[in-house]
Structures are given as C-alpha cells and as structure tokens.
Amino acid sequence: MKRFMDEDFLLDTETAQRLYHEHAAKMPILDAHSHIHPREIAEDKRYRNLAEAWLADDHAKWRLMRANGVTEKTITGGSTPGRERFQAFAEMMPKAVGNPMYDWAHLELARYFHCHVPLSGKTAEEVWQQAGIALSQPDMTAQGILRSSRVKVLCTCDDPTDDLRWHKAVKQAGCETVVLPTFRADAALTIEDPEWENYMKYDLGQAADVDISTMADVREALHRRLDYFAAQGCRIVDCSVECVRYHEVEEFELDDIVGKYINGKGT
C-alpha cells in the first residue's frame, strides 16, 4: 500500500518527480514571508514538543481551531498544557481536508518528524511521542532546522514600531541563514480599528519620534521607520490589503480625518 503523503506527494507524473527530486529539492529556499520570530533564531531555540513548535504563535492554526469551536483559553491560554492544546488541534485536522494547512502539517510531520500517519484525535498521542523523539535530536533547533532545510534567506513579519533588536542578535549569533525584517504595516492602515489612535500616537509616533496629528505626520513617521528598517536590510513591504479603495481628496480633508481619530478635532 502506498504510504500516506510519501515523497511524491502532488508529483503525479514522472516529469514532475524528476524535476522536483533532481533539481528543485536541492535548491536553496528564499522565504519572503515567514512567521518565525527572530528571537527563536537568535537564541537557537529548541522546541520541547509539537505544541511549542506549531501552536505557540501560528495564527493560521489558531483560526482553524477557532472555526472548530475550540475555546480561546485552549488556543492561546498560557496555562493550557501543551499536550491538551495539541489534542484539540489534532481533533480538528480531519475536518481541514481541502485546506492548505492539512497538507502543510502532514508534509512537516513526514519531512521533519518521520511520521506518516494521518493526524487525528486518535493518532495524536502517537504523533506527539514520535515528534518528541525527533525534536530531541541535536540538530533540531531553530537554526538547525533552517540549515537542514537549505533556507538561505528568511524574511520575518515585523511591525513598523519594532526595534529589530532580535534581527541584530541573529547577525551577532553567526546564523548561516540571512534573516531580514519585512515592513508589516497593517496596524497603520486599519484606521477603522478602535486601537488605531493609540497605535499612531503612542506606538508609531514614539518609535519614529513624530507627534502625529496630520496626514503629513503619518507619512513622516512611516518614512522614518522605513528608513530604519532599510538600514537593517529590509527590502519588502508586506501588507494584508483585502481591496484597494481610491477616492481623491484634498490634503486638508486627509488632515481632518486623521485629526478626528487622533484628537477628536477633525470634522
């Protein structure tokens, strides 16, 4: 019987198999969008279990768990045992068939943890134990995994207010992978968010040393942070914009909008 998600998964023809195994699989990875925190790389973190490796800070996995009715305490609660959190994730997986996460999770189980069984509530303990054995190996650290995966460049997602201290620490640690920040400016673009005022005044404004009250101030603050990021090697702006709306207005109208949200003085 063919093994579940074997080395030829999605490679349905001989040509596809040859192109991948003889060429693509050997090429270095340039990852332009990663959710790995640079601190984990700088400290060469060793993950104790799959809950730490998968569920500590992965919003895509969290969204699926929420959609399956898992409580927020179980998903993000710091007091929830890792094994319990992983069980909830495993019980959700059979319902995720057709979602890219189903393929991603099982490909990782196969490639990094040598586990080839479909993840479910019934197989959770078996997968947990097998992954634990794999994670205990000397090279299964944050930098070790990047090295074995041939990741040449990795770009993290970073808010414009980030001081990028951990990117500097990665360089000092001598990591073989080049780790660069990306300018993730979502918080600056979501003016409808109730926290936008505080973000602009106390987060972005303070980070850029700009007293924000007009649209020109917003631009100046973002430009300063862009310059700071660029000095640390950033070359990518990564924004989640569902649709682009355009309406031509005068500069004073933009100032009114910003003023209304920042200090209640706009009209």
At which residue positions do the language-model features occur?
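Metal-cofactor-binding active-site regions of metalloenzymes
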Residues: 1-267
